[in-house]
A protein has these predicted regions:
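Alpha/propeptide regions of enzymes that mature by internal proteolysis
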Residues: 2, 8-16, 25-338
Length: 338
């Protein structure tokens, strides 16, 4: 049953709005799926199998990110880096074309938090479940409890972090230039970003939009910390009359501006997807300041109702995957402002 309706607003004469195009939004493609980072190539491929057969965007965005969640040594699922106490905790949210949404946070030992989030949406009167309650619900829905053992990569990283760890809040961790800082995403020695989230948005052949976002959160975070990824309006937002957006990067700064909701509202006001994302990134710089933004990364991606897409980020290095045909699944480098 679908009983969650989040911020359903009136149409406000939306049919009169025109969206400006730009080069990497193409001519408008339906169906279309886009997702954050290079892990999005495999995720898009799984989502595309559903979209090309006329399937629903909601099913596509769930199945797509499950591919990434399922990786053993990866940045998103149970194979990701743990918190400071050595436990992997997962967050996810999902939203459909009817403004139904579901979310889980601080979830342990469940392989596919995105699917649990969908069950929250479809089988409870709530939007979000957290912690032991989310785990209890997942088990009651037939999700098996997995081993709490860290992956080989995560265990190695955790032991390395413990050598110099300090168990206290790191207020200005974004200023750290260490490749093994207490947070991710952070800039690595090779200039790339260590990221920990996949967000996906899609439009199906019916013209309906949906989105998903799943993460392990910041590596070595304080126990109980949540970022933007499971928060509807921050890490993900869908308005079927306008468009859909998702975020990646320093979650606290995405939350401060209700980032994905802001991107969609920018599109409501006539911005192209790319320019809508750019305006949201500019808002972060305005709120946080240029100097503090130089050592963090935030990126947004978005699609509109016409099947146009775009993305923008703070720093060079963010990219996203785009798929709209069997032979059209490719990476796009996000434009950046710093």
């Amino acid at each position: 049953m679908h009983r969650r309706n989040f911020l359903q607003w009136g149409s406000l004469g939306l049919s009169a709005i025109t969206f400006s195009g730009f080069r990497n939004s193409g001519t408008g493609n339906k169906p279309l799926v886009i997702s954050t980072w290079d892990a999005g190539i495999a995720a898009n491929a799984a989502a595309w199998k559903i979209l090309r057969s006329g399937g629903r965007a909601l099913d596509a965005v769930e199945k797509g990110v499950m591919v990434t969640e399922n990786e053993i040594n990866c940045c998103v699922g149970l194979g990701a880096n743990p918190d400071r106490d050595g436990f992997v905790t997962l967050d996810a949210c999902i939203m459909d074309e009817n403004a139904n949404c579901g979310s889980v946070a601080f979830l342990e030992r469940i392989k596919h938090p995105i699917s649990v989030a969908r069950r929250v949406m479809e089988k409870t009167p709530h939007v979000m479940l957290v912690g032991s309650g989310a785990q209890q619900f997942a088990v009651s829905e037939g999700f098996p409890l997995e081993s709490g053992k860290l992956s080989d990569d995560a265990e190695k990283a955790y032991k390395n972090w413990l050598k110099k760890s300090e168990y206290k809040p790191v207020i200005n961790v974004e200023r750290s230039k260490s490749p093994m800082a207490n947070n991710v995403p952070t800039r690595l020695e090779n200039g790339q970003w260590n990221h920990d989230t996949i967000g996906m948005v899609a439009i199906d052949v019916q013209g309906n939009l949906s989105g998903s976002c799943t993460t392990s959160g910041m590596g070595f975070k304080m126990r109980g910390r949540l970022g933007d990824s499971p928060i509807i309006g921050a890490g993900l937002f869908v308005d079927n009359e306008i468009g859909a957006a998702t975020a990646t990067g320093q979650g606290e700064d995405v939350i401060r501006i209700c980032g994905s909701h802001l991107v969609v509202e920018n599109m409501r006001n006539g911005f192209s997807p790319e320019n809508a994302c750019k305006a949201a990134v500019e808002r972060i710089v305005k709120v946080k300041g240029v100097e503090k933004c130089k050592e963090i990364q935030v990126g947004f991606i978005a699609i509109n109702k016409r099947g146009e897409y775009g993305g923008y980020c703070l720093q060079k290095g963010f990219n996203f995957a785009v798929c709209y045909a069997d032979d059209k699944n490719f990476m796009v480098d996000g434009k950046y402002i710093l």
